[in-house]
């Protein structure tokens, strides 16, 4: 029968894993900021830094995943403890994918700034989209840290705003390309950037939904905003 000491060890292991998830989240936040800054400023050293740090994001995912595997094997968690471990495993997958999208933006920044220099009026909209997604990610990480399921509602609303911004940017970019065919190549690159940011928002939304699963025991993936509100409010 498990002793109090065993339970304390288990709790300590879970807290250590959660702390590493937040560490990974902080690194991914920095990756997004640096990637977008590299795109806007043309700072290729910053773009290179994002590319190099992607390895650190990946390494953290592998390390945390291994820790979770060991916890399941040794402790055989049940009920809410098992949901906690599963929340961590799913969360780090989405964080790693957000990191991949940030690295993609850094690569696109190199392509854009190493090509022909032309007017790039859509950077302000890219910056705005990125700010929305960064706020979503911070809220998702805060919800993870506090086990606050209500963050999922805020984030789902913001995800709708990000999706609308993407559609608006798409229309603008198509208009610019039609008006000046010389811009087609660079604006297609910017379109890939905005799509990467939109995907980041999707991953942040996923993360908030895992917290709902942890706290409420309800899977709200692929449900409407109204259904999420019903579960958590």
Predicted regions and their residues:
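Cytosolic, long alpha-helical scaffolding segments
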Residues: 1-233
